[in-house]
Amino acid sequence: MRTNWFETFFQGITLDLWRAFATPELTRMEVDFLESVFPKGARLLDTPCGNGRLTLELARRGFDTTGIDISKEFIHEAAQEGQKAGVKTAFEVGDMRALKWTEEFDGALCWGNSFGYFEYPDMMKFVAGVARALKTGGRLVVQGGIAAEAIIPQIKERETYQVNDITFTIENRYLAAESCLETKGTFTRDGKEEVRMFWHHIYTLAEIRRMLASHGLNTIDTFSSMDRAPFALGSEQLILLAQKL
């Protein structure tokens, strides 16, 4: 089902491919950036946190972290990894559209194309919830490659990639009337094939800024990379930094 595709997406070969992309080196580089954004020792909310790779690395560096994800498997994996590493953090199964906290966090992050999982009404539930969860002056970082200015210039009908022993083919269809990118992914390894459908709702930078501003989150900067290069048409990703007024 389109609205909840992500609940069952990260399984099997698909999950192995995601792990191959999310290397320890990438995680360290991303957390280097996040460490420069948030005050030392800040209480942070990572939503959705996936398998907790950023949540755990931030905790290792002294942040008080909480990770929330809709996947029970991811949360179980994250909690086990934290226990094994002796890292103190909190993980909860939950929906990013139904955050329960009020003025408890110094910062929050929505990393990795998650801002776009939903159509406008549900996306606004997340915005309202994360704004409520932040203290006044708290910061939000949104990152992903699906802002309109980033993804639309780069959409191809079909692409094939090889990652280690996995062949990954994507077939894209842009639904202009809905501003939605529909993608069929075919994942193949050792003769075994998995097919997944996924959808991302595409918002322009101006739309994202307005969505955040409607709940008191003022955009203070945008980047296209973790070395803070400016965001522009054709950039591979958007990193947006906002602050609660």
Language-model segments: residues:
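SAM-dependent methyltransferase
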Residues: 121, 141-211
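Class I SAM-dependent methyltransferase SAM/SAH-binding core
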Residues: 53-98
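C-terminal lobe and adjacent flexible extensions of AdoMet/dcAdoMet transferase-like proteins
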Residues: 205-245
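Conserved class I S-adenosyl-L-methionine
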Residues: 1-48
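A short glycine-rich, Lys/Arg-flanked "PGG" loop and its adjoining helix->strand segment in the class I
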Residues: 124-136
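A short acidic, Gly/Pro-enriched loop at the edge of an enzyme's catalytic core
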Residues: 100-107
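Residues lining the SAM
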Residues: 111-113
